[in-house]
Amino acid sequence: MCIRDRYSIDEFFMDVTDSYHRFSSTVHSFCIKLMKEIYEQTQIYCTIGIGSNMLLSKLAMDIEAKHNDNRIAEWRYQNVPEKLWNIQPLHKFWGINTRTEKKLNKRGIFTIGDLAHYPYQYLKRDFGIKGIDLHLHAHGIDQSKIREKHKITNPSICKSQILMHDYTYEDAKVVMQELIEDVAMRVRLRKMRARTIHFSFGYKDGGGVHKQFTLDEPTNLEKEIWKGVEKWANQLCEKELLYRTLSVSLTQFVPEGIQQLNLFVDEYERKRSEALAKAIDQLQEKYGKGIVSKAISYTDAGTKYGRLGLMAGHKM
């Protein structure tokens, strides 16, 4: 059996431990066949990293395979000293951003080899749980399993975006509203409402704000979702910093027909707003998402029209 776990819209992990032998004699030759089949069906060249775990396979792809003529690289535990420990600067390593890199540099850590040989107890003391992961990853150890990740216990509807240039906080909020507009429409098309919202604002130099909150009443209206997101973002985000990534996801769905009576909610206004939103949804389904837009999407900060017609960030 082959088990897959999607990492992004154009990357995924595959565990073929128990199945590659059905198609080829080695994992490497299996990957060659897979690449050929993908190209024949899509005319797209792909890159493959093979590893003893998810971490090593990802690093093999990012650091070596993308620069190989055959676009395949294989990293095993025995390759850790020669391939992993020479990686520098540190932010090239999966899971280390520039902010963490600066903290590590202050401790005399400039390569993954330095990190691997830095006392474990100090990493744990200074970085907590992340310090434990840094120690394990520097030795090529990744305890996560695709089989564990594959189970979907709480479905969600999400949208994320990597910004094309640095955004101020106020401009980033414009894009966040566009993302919320998208996920709210998708919830309405499923005839559902969402109760829990998770959002993130990622800083240019690494790090950022992540927040999850639960609404008193489930909703599928972007103005109600945005009200909660803006409230928490204004409290948590560093206004003077620049931003490069944004995301929002909705979970804990309930059918539209299930609604508890709330004396503090204007039921007439809520139904009126939902009816208007659904009318716009129908227009966008019929004529395309660009047919109706909010004024913010026409500002310099808006990205909606730039994203129309893109797949995985590429023009189709």
Predicted regions and their residues:
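Nucleic-acid-contacting surfaces of polymerase cores and analogous helical-repeat interfaces
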Residues: 4-166, 282, 295-316
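DNA-contacting surface of Y-family translesion DNA polymerases
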Residues: 92, 102-243
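Single conserved hydrophobic/aromatic residue that forms the stacking wall/gate
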Residues: 1-3, 288
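Acidic, metal-coordinating catalytic segment for phosphate/diphosphate chemistry
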Residues: 218-316
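Short, hydrophobic beta-strand segments
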Residues: 12-18, 210-215, 260-266
